[in-house]
């Protein structure tokens, strides 16, 4: 089997599961309030609706083109149905607040559809600012949350690993590969602090605190700027 590091590889390897890359379809399967560009937002009792806007498909990852916005549906819907605020190829979804988990799962020998079909083996909690969804400041290895995956995820078969991202128990991304490799094999409590191109001064500071630098999976850092779509360039992590 191909060693999968990227979503585009998983797209080619698992054509039967390509629905997982459709983030709008995942949101609707999970019962979230969501819709593509041009679909009006639900009208709420408090007149405001906080949403995250993202590309329906983004096989590059890194939160490209994602942003949070609070709408006034009674006023803004007239613009939204004419492509105001939300560009073609994007969708809106209700915004969830809470702990950001990234969980790597491996397939067990339990049958397809079993509650125990997938076993978590590396869980990280990430920290970031709401006004910059691509620039994380810290990842910490933690024990996995105690919850059951939705049945439609348990029924994914012929795949070796999954990476699931969620806010508390609200899943928002599914990857047919691992995602937490930077802390694989590390004990609970281990930390990975991203080092960004404009913050390289932190390397020496963190080395004095016992951290060790680990470069990106791909040594060519330009591969992490999405051909200019990302303004923040990650060059690696400090691990402790």
What are these model-predicted stretches?
Residues 1-5:
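N-terminal non-globular leader segments, chiefly Sec-dependent signal peptides
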Residues 6-152:
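Active-site nucleotide/adenylate-binding loops and adjacent lid/helix of ATP-dependent enzymes
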Residues 62, 110-113, 124-132, 138-240:
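ATP-dependent carboxylate activation and anion-phosphoryl transfer catalytic cores
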């Amino acid at each position: 089997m191909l060693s999968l590091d990227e979503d585009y590889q998983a797209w080619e390897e698992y054509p039967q599961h390509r629905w997982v890359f459709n983030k709008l379809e995942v949101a609707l399967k999970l019962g979230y309030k969501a819709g593509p560009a041009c679909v009006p937002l639900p009208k709420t009792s408090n007149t405001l609706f906080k949403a995250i806007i993202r590309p329906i498909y983004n096989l590059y990852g890194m939160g490209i083109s994602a942003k949070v916005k609070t709408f006034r549906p009674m006023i803004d819907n007239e613009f939204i149905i004419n492509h105001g605020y939300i560009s073609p190829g994007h969708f809106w979804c209700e915004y969830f607040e809470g702990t950001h988990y990234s969980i790597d799962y491996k397939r067990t020998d339990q049958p397809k559809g079993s509650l125990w079909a997938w076993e978590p083996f590396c869980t990280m909690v990430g920290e970031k600012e709401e006004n910059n969804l691509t620039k994380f400041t810290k990842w910490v290895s933690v024990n996995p949350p105690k919850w059951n995956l939705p049945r439609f995820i348990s029924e994914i078969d012929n795949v070796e690993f999954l990476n699931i991202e969620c806010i508390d128990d609200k899943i928002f991304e599914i990857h047919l590969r691992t995602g937490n490799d930077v802390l694989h094999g590390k004990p609970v409590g281990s930390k990975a602090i991203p080092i960004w191109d404009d913050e390289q001064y932190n390397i020496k500071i963190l080395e004095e605190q016992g951290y060790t630098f680990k470069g990106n999976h791909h040594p060519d850092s330009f591969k992490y700027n999405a051909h200019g779509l990302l303004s923040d360039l990650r060059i690696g992590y400090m691990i402790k």
